[in-house]
């Protein structure tokens, strides 16, 4: 588990950008899913291709929860809209998502798929804009709050078992 910092891309090498793999000691791992360059938070890095395939397969609807800060105040009707599934890019129906308000500009969003820039596009479809996006949990495991940006640690046996149990691997 890594607390991905802003400004890094989810790749092993890139000529133009810093890569998260530069931050870890081992180079035999790869990112399980992606967070865009400006998104921070929980990034799973593994050397188990089978695990990666299962966690990313659309069949499993792996849960991902994000802390979101928006440009405009949040509207309460968005809770129902997210529960029904937002249409992004004028034609792509997202699976239902859970939106939980913190205050007028901050919320948590839980999604069960991983379309390209999905949460940002969901808010754009609702005439709002994401100004900060931070993944707080992945596959039922919460980001270790003691990890500073750029730091990582191995999953505990309990965390790994929780993922396996939740998604029947």
Predicted features by range, described:
Residues 1-169:
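RNA pseudouridine synthases
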